[in-house]
Structure formats: structure tokens, C-alpha cells
A protein has these predicted regions:
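Short, structured secondary-structure elements
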Residues: 1-186
Length: 186
């Protein structure tokens, strides 16, 4: 059976913003019997800042965003600009190809804007360690491995971790291909 307008209002708001609609929004939608009421209600939800915040959260999980370094001393990082870039990109309905280019190579665009430079913080969303006794070269290498694996899983929908050690006859990516991608991010 078709959902009633009250349930529909709730489902749309929760799906698009992660938040329930206000009582006023629900009442306005229920009482609007004109053509296009549903489309207007959807647009109302899409125009809320909560839309970008809700959908950016899922992208930020994929991008391994965190406000901390991820280790025992766990100092705060100043990476919130990347979070805000992702939220505004969703709220502005930025085309996905542009969103992708800016995160992978925004700094390589001709005359990059501050926003495009901030977008490349996608590559900085990796664990950082400032503890004494760590090997800078080893840690740099681990960060490159993390960038390769994350970039491939986010944009290609496949993991490359196995190819880091060996070529497997059932995996689509060989060890040689893994290290070619590694060389790009190194």
C-alpha cells in the first residue's frame, strides 16, 4: 500500500537530511494538495544545510576523515576545512567528476582556488604519528600505502591490499599494477 503523506514526509526528510521534518513542514506538506507538492517538499529538504551534512558524513567515512591523529597521544588536527569542503560540495550539488578531480589532483589544476587546494586534503586523511622513535621513511611509506588503498576502494570499488604482496590469479589487479599506482602517490 502507498504510504500516507505524514509517513512520506518523514521518510523523505530522514532519507535526505537524516533528521525528522519539523511539525510545520509536515503540516504544510499534508495540506498541500496541488500538483507538484511532493517535488516541492523534496526540494525543500535538498535545500537544507542538513542535506550536505548528512550525505557528507558517509563520504567522510570513506575518506577516513577524523579530527584526531588516530594514535595514543591523539592531538587534534586542523583538517576541518576538508570536512566543510565536502559538506558544501554536497549542498552545492557539485558534479561528481569535478568533486573527484578536486580531491585527487586539485593542486594540479591551473590556478587552483583555495577550495580546490583544500579538497586535496583527501590525501592527508591518514594516520599521523609524532611519537619519538618512529621512522619517518617507514611512516611516509605507510601513508602512501593508505592513500593507494583508500583511493582505489573509494573510486574504483575494489581493494588493492592483496596486490601489495603478491599477484593473485583471481584478483583484477596485479602486484606490478599496484606499484604503478603506488608510484603515482609516492
Amino acid at each position: 500500500p502507498e504510504a500516507d503523506k505524514n509517513a512520506l514526509a518523514r521518510r523523505v526528510a530522514l532519507d535526505l537530511t537524516g533528521l525528522p521534518p519539523t511539525p510545520e513542514e509536515t503540516e504544510a506538506f499534508i495540506s498541500d494538495s496541488t500538483s507538484g507538492a511532493y517535488q516541492r517538499y523534496v526540494q525543500l529538504q535538498l535545500n537544507k544545510p542538513a542535506f550536505g551534512e548528512h550525505w557528507a558524513r558517509m563520504w567522510l567515512d570513506l575518506a577516513r576523515y577524523a579530527d584526531s591523529a588516530g594514535y595514543a597521544d591523539d592531538p587534534l588536527r586542523t583538517i576541518w576545512g576538508f570536512r566543510d569542503y565536502v559538506i558544501s560540495s554536497f549542498n552545492e550539488n557539485k558534479p561528481f567528476d569535478q568533486f573527484t578531480i578536486e580531491q585527487i589532483a586539485g593542486d594540479l589544476l591551473p590556478n587552483p582556488t583555495t577550495e580546490q587546494l583544500v579538497a586535496t586534503a583527501f590525501h592527508r586523511n591518514t594516520k599521523t604519528n609524532s611519537e619519538g622513535g618512529t621512522s619517518d621513511e617507514e611512516f611516509r611509506n605507510e601513508a602512501v600505502v593508505d592513500r593507494v588503498n583508500t583511493t582505489m576502494s573509494v573510486w574504483m570499488g575494489t581493494t588493492m591490499a592483496c596486490a601489495q604482496c603478491h599477484t593473485h590469479k583471481y584478483d583484477p589487479i596485479t602486484q606490478e599494477e599496484y606499484f604503478k599506482v603506488f608510484a603515482i602517490f609516492n
